[in-house]
A protein has these predicted regions:
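A charged, aromatic-enriched C-terminal amphipathic alpha-helix characteristic of glycosyltransferases
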Residues: 22, 362-392
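Membrane-proximal helix-turn-helix segments that form the acceptor-binding/catalytic region
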Residues: 94-95, 153-173
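Conserved donor-binding/catalytic core segment of Leloir-type glycosyltransferases
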Residues: 222-238, 244-247
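Nucleotide-activated donor-binding/catalytic signature segment of Leloir-type glycosyltransferases, i.e.
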Residues: 271-288
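Short alpha-helical donor nucleotide-sugar binding micro-motif in glycosyltransferases
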Residues: 287-289, 294-298
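Aromatic "clamp/platform" in nucleotide-sugar-dependent glycosyltransferases that forms part
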Residues: 306
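Short hydrophobic beta-strand element within catalytic cores of glycosyltransferases
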Residues: 323-326
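Conserved acidic donor-binding segment of nucleotide-sugar-dependent glycosyltransferases
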Residues: 340-348, 356-362
């Protein structure tokens, strides 16, 4: 590690429980590595915000929702609520950094950064280094809109100007792929990527996988069946409906086909879709602490998402050496390279790819070998941590 101050405040708008399944799934290994190297690191999240502060925010929002132009527009109310929540967390981060003596603050979205910038200016913390990671593909207003926080064109333009203002004032801006940074610049109408923007990949996870038969036994799966795995939140932008429909169609020819979906969310619609296609007994849902047995037991991994800045589950499946079929969206081509079968967001293309993998073991072996070759090029945790240390200290 380089010389300099050894402390950083990490700031998210998540709850502590999200460290396992949300942003923390990629962030906590970095936090743990920094702590192991003698750093003082705090992970500031929603649970650190006092109840009285949340109550004040809610009362303020209730008054704001009565204003002309806001009262009759629920989408605007939702955006204001999300923005206020993040600005308040950023404000808390500025106070926490001052009170606890942090010399670097890393915020995990630009709306948090807005609140921090306001607090930093108000508290006179001009010497405090700070930066932002953009976790979506492109600008944050695009990412939140695609995730269901509906924004009309006028509101989108205003939010993008606000985002550009915040990013310009940060000491660093990172995204997990170069493609994501390039899209961010296009979304914000910038002529080039600023020099303080950096692409820093997620680190390759260390995996100690069981043999397939042992993994199947531990999960109660039959090793004679063909198991397809999908991982992610059960939300519309993941398009698991395409995966369910494709598997249901293929199951008419391959009755041993089973689909396993790991993730939080409303599974009722997907179950109904499977039931209607006669596939209901072959779809399985789970929320688990340890995904490694599933990677070890699965025969193929599939992602049907319409957007990914990086695609952490894709990356994990690649590192596990699984044959991977992924939609070629966002930063996925950069991360997966030749290690995955890249397809459009299309049921027919997915069926064709899965059909080939089920019917031809040599195809699976070839794709698994490509995954292993691509995985060998992935950065390790030590390299990733060193990139962040350079930002925090310089």
């Amino acid at each position: 590690m380089t010389e300099g101050p050894h402390n950083v405040l990490m700031v998210t708008r998540e709850m502590s429980g999200d460290r396992r399944y949300g942003l923390g799934r990629s962030l906590m290994p970095i936090v743990d590595a920094l702590v192991g190297n003698g750093w003082r690191v705090r992970y500031l999240c929603q649970e650190d915000l006092a109840a009285a502060s949340k109550d004040r925010r809610n009362r303020w929002l209730a008054r704001l929702r009565q204003l002309p132009g806001v009262a009759s527009r629920p989408p605007v109310q939702q955006v204001l609520g999300a923005l206020a929540e993040r600005v308040q967390m950023g404000w808390l981060a500025a106070h926490t950094a001052r009170d606890e003596g942090y010399t670097a603050v890393h915020l995990h979205d630009p709306w948090l950064g807005l609140g921090f910038w306001i607090g930093r200016k108000r508290l006179g913390l001009q010497n405090l280094r700070w930066g932002i990671t953009e976790h979506g593909f492109g600008c944050y207003s695009r990412a939140t809109h695609e995730d269901g926080l509906v924004q009309g064109p006028r509101l989108q333009r205003w939010l993008r100007r606000l985002e550009a203002f915040v990013l310009q004032r940060a000491d660093w801006v990172t995204a997990p792929t170069q493609l994501a940074l390039d899209q961010l610049a296009r979304d914000l109408a910038l002529p080039f990527n600023p020099p303080h923007w950096h692409a820093i990949s997620h680190a390759a996870p260390v995996m100690a996988l069981m043999q397939r038969e042992a993994a199947c036994q531990s999960l109660g799966w039959s090793p004679q069946n063909f198991h397809v795995l999908g991982v992610g939140r059960l939300v519309p932008l993941k398009r698991f409906d395409i995966l369910v429909a494709a598997c249901a169609s293929l199951a008419l020819r391959y009755p041993s086909l089973h689909l396993h979906l790991l993730g939080d969310g409303d599974r009722a619609g997907l179950q109904q879709l499977a039931d209607a296609a006669g596939f209901g007994d072959h779809i399985h849902f789970a929320m688990v602490d340890d995904v490694q047995p599933y990677y070890a037991a699965a025969d193929a991994y599939v992602s049907t998402s319409v957007t990914e800045s990086f695609g952490l589950a894709n990356f994990e499946a690649l590192i596990a050496g699984l044959p991977c079929v992924c939609t070629a969206v966002g930063g996925v081509p950069e991360v997966m390279g030749n290690g995955a079968w890249l397809i459009p967001v299309n049921q027919g293309a997915l069926e064709a790819a899965l059909d080939a993998l089920i019917d031809q073991p040599t195809q699976r072996q070839t794709l698994a070998a490509r995954a292993a070759a691509q995985a060998a090029q992935a950065p390790n945790l030590e390299w990733v941590v060193e990139q962040y240390v350079r930002l925090f200290q310089h």
